[in-house]
Amino acid sequence: MQLVPTLGAIQVVTLLGNAAFAGVATSIMAFSRVMTAYFVGRLTDQHGRKAGMYLGLWLSLVGALVIGMATLLGSFALFCVGALIFGSGVGAVQQMRVAAADMYPPSRRGEGISLVAMGSLFGSGISPLLVSLAERLGKLLGINEIALAWLLVPVLVLPCFLLVKSIRPDPKQIALEMEKYYPVWALDSAGSNSVELDRGDLLRVRIAAILSAVTVQGQMVMMMAMTALALKALDCSLSQISFSVALHAMGMFAFSWPIGRLADRIGRKPVILAGLVVAGSGALLVGLGDGYWVITTGTFLVGLGWSGAFLGSNTMVTDVTPPTKRGQAIGVLELWSNAAGMTLPILGGLIVEGFDLHMLGFFGALLVLIPIFVMAQVREQRPGNYR
């Protein structure tokens, strides 16, 4: 997934020769995730979480190969097909968050979801290494280095099938029989009170959580897609851009475990609000910066803010949703989040083309104000309990 913000905008500009459509790659990925999110959620609610993860791995593998071939052939149409397939796979694999929510008791649900995000550190760490390897092999073999980076992705995907197979029983089954796996105190000490809430209260909590996730996801994708292109305009090397994206990803995932623990300890709401504020501050820093390290620091903060707001929102949604409907609930969150991730990069491209990166940063900061106001209205009595 980290190859998309690293290479996607550059590939589109190379294939089309127009920076105005630089966000198209990220938007295509988001569109495919929009189209699959809810349906994969229904699939996992009916057939278990592992079914969704297997589907996602297969689609990701095939999509990466198609993108690599499209780059070699110089075909934008084939590139779009590959991005659609790859994006669908990435979207399906997101059911891992539902699996984590299923496998942990309410008092540790934030921690469980955050551990999945921690696993993404592998991707953020391996991405610059993969790009660096592709650069060296590309020069040695006379192959386009960007295409080669995508063609190497299946080597990383194949071992994941064995990891998914090792999960027993299916996480959904664990959620339905939670008392078999955890002591009573762990189940009662915190967590969902969805049965006690009326439909209006449930709706308010879900809207606040989904709006926060949608905004911070769209803002993060927009900033990342455009800043990669801005760094390219500063004559930064592909390795420098990849390193910048890796630092952004470190912000997204490196602190997710303590953030998840914090959400379990002090509540989902304060963690979400803090994340939104940090994401807005990072966007402002990007808008004010002209150099490599200032922009990179800003995108790191955007990633860190995303971690708090997005993980907290996912945890809040699962708090008020029973196991038999969690896949669909997170599917709805994914649908709207990726709809924002689809449209905002295109808007970001137009802002950069019509104005500059400074205006993009200010716009990114303004986006978080609405979810901050809505989330402030949520009443969380204790972590995972709402009224």
Where are these regions (language model features)?
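Helix-loop boundary and gating motifs at the non-cytosolic
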Residues: 1-31, 207-212, 220-231
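Intracellular juxtamembrane helix-capping segments at the cytosolic ends
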Residues: 8, 91-104, 308-321
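Helix-to-loop junctions at the C-terminal end of transmembrane segments
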Residues: 36-48, 255-267, 352
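C-terminal ends and interior cores of transmembrane alpha-helices
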Residues: 58-73, 278-290
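Hydrophobic core of transmembrane alpha-helices in multi-pass small-molecule transporters
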Residues: 76-91, 294-308
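Cytoplasmic helix-loop-helix junction between adjacent transmembrane helices
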Residues: 84-118
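Helix-loop-helix hairpin linking two adjacent transmembrane segments in secondary transporters
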Residues: 116-165
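C-terminal membrane-cytosol helix-exit motif in multi-pass small-molecule transporters
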Residues: 154-179, 374-379
